[in-house]
């Protein structure tokens, strides 16, 4: 693109190597975000399966200690969906930080 090397206020002029590196960072970031989304989807499915199994195992209130209920409590205590969401934010932050390291804006 012709406008790739135009000066943006507050930023230095980027070389083609800078632009190529920035594009690599963005591509790897997109790949990581796709992996995170796949994991979050799998975890959501796991939660639904574990909830259904726990519900099916409780024929009476005293069955709260069934292996399925114990597994659901373990899963919920580990907070995997929360950690997957944190990972998404951290990936986005990391990509932004790498791009900023390449662009080297003035000020701020």
From Swiss-Prot:
Give the Gene Ontology MF terms in alphabetical order.
nucleotide binding
Residues annotated as binding 3',3'-cGAMP: 4, 11, 26
InterPro entries named in the record: Acb2/Tad1_hairpin
Q: Per the record, what phenotype accompanies loss of this gene's function?
A: Phage becomes sensitive to CBASS type II-2 system; phage titer decreases over 10(5)-fold.
Q: What induces it?
A: Probably not expressed during lysogeny maintenance, is probably induced during lysogeny induction.
Q: Which UniProt keywords apply?
A: Nucleotide-binding
Summarize subunit and interaction data from the UniProt record for this chain.
Answer: Homohexamer in apo and 3',3'-cGAMP-bound form.
What family name appears in the similarity comment?
A: Belongs to the Acb2 family.
Role noted for this protein: Antagonizes CBASS (cyclic oligonucleotide-based antiphage signaling system). Binds and sequesters host-produced 3',3'-cyclic GMP-AMP (cGAMP) (thus preventing host CapV activation) without degrading the cyclic nucleotide. Probably binds some other cyclic dinucleotides as well.
Q: What is this protein called?
A: Anti-CBASS protein 2
């Amino acid at each position: 693109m012709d406008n790739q090397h135009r000066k943006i206020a507050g930023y230095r002029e980027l070389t083609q190597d800078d632009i190529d590196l920035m594009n690599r960072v963005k591509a790897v970031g997109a790949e990581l975000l796709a992996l995170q989304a796949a994991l979050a989807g799998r975890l959501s499915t796991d939660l639904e399966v574990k909830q259904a199994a726990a519900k099916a195992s409780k024929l009476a209130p005293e069955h709260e200690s069934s292996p399925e209920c114990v597994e659901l409590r373990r899963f919920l205590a580990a907070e995997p969906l929360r950690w997957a969401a944190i990972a998404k934010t951290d990936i986005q932050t990391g990509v932004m930080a790498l791009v900023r390291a390449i662009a080297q804006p003035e000020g701020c």
